[in-house]
């Protein structure tokens, strides 16, 4: 245990077998494959003489709670999860830096809040990327209107069920339209908390895994240089994110 210790945090959900099949389902695709990013980062830390630790705070999905009381937890979750993430960070006092992995519109803002709330530590974010489009199906933006279209008798129940099942063309990643999830990934990159081109990589792709490896290497370099979140989050980086968002 003589190596420098680094903490990996994520929003992982579900239980994924090594072949990708589900032992237990997650709430959504956005947290289904992020464990692979954690594994890649952990192996990279180990290969360079560091000791990886890992912690988790999973996240829900509005796609499951629309029209139910569960939607009352949607916005509140971000603050609650950010608090728990920060408690996990403080609960490993020997950590030299934090690598956060998150994807969607609740887990990723929560992770950003937690990293921003750790100004004296080197931190980096690895976005969980996006799911791919399916052939002959509606995207994850359009399917959110299925309930309204069904209520207006514009589609049949059978069509709504089929489109809902086909919306995600791959098992991992966030919604592939520029909603809050994808926008949060872009804003995180604009803030300088991810590597360049870190946002919106296709989940499961080689470039997606390589991002985790390079992010772990970057965090090692940040720690070596004494560069912390306080140095990355500045008036200029926030201006850059605002311009990008606008």
Question: Which positions does each model-derived feature cover?
Answer:
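Metallocofactor- and cofactor-centric catalytic cores in central/energy metabolism, strongly enriched
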Residues: 1-246
């Amino acid at each position: 245990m003589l190596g420098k210790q680094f903490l990996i945090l994520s929003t992982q959900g579900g239980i994924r077998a090594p072949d990708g099949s589900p032992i237990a389902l997650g709430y959504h695709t956005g947290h289904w494959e992020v464990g692979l990013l954690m594994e890649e980062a952990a192996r990279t830390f180990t290969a360079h003489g560091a000791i990886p630790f890992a912690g988790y705070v999973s996240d829900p999905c509005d796609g499951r709670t629309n029209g139910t009381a569960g939607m009352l937890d949607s916005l509140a979750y971000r603050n609650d999860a950010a608090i728990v993430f920060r408690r996990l960070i403080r609960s490993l006092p020997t950590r030299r830096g934090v690598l956060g992995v998150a994807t969607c519109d609740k887990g990723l803002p929560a992770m950003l809040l937690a990293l921003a709330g750790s100004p004296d530590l080197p931190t980096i974010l690895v976005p969980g990327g996006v799911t791919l489009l399916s052939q002959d199906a509606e995207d994850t933006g359009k399917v959110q209107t299925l309930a309204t279209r069904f209520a207006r008798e514009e589609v049949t129940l059978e069509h709504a069920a089929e489109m809902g099942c086909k919306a995600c063309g791959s098992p991992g990643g966030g919604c592939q339209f520029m909603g809050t999830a994808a926008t949060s990934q872009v804003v995180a990159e604009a803030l300088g908390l991810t590597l360049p081109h870190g946002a919106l990589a296709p989940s499961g792709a080689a470039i997606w895994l390589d991002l985790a490896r390079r992010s772990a290497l970057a965090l090692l370099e940040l720690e070596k240089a004494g560069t912390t979140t306080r140095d990355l989050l500045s008036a200029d980086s926030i201006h850059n994110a605002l311009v990008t968002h606008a």
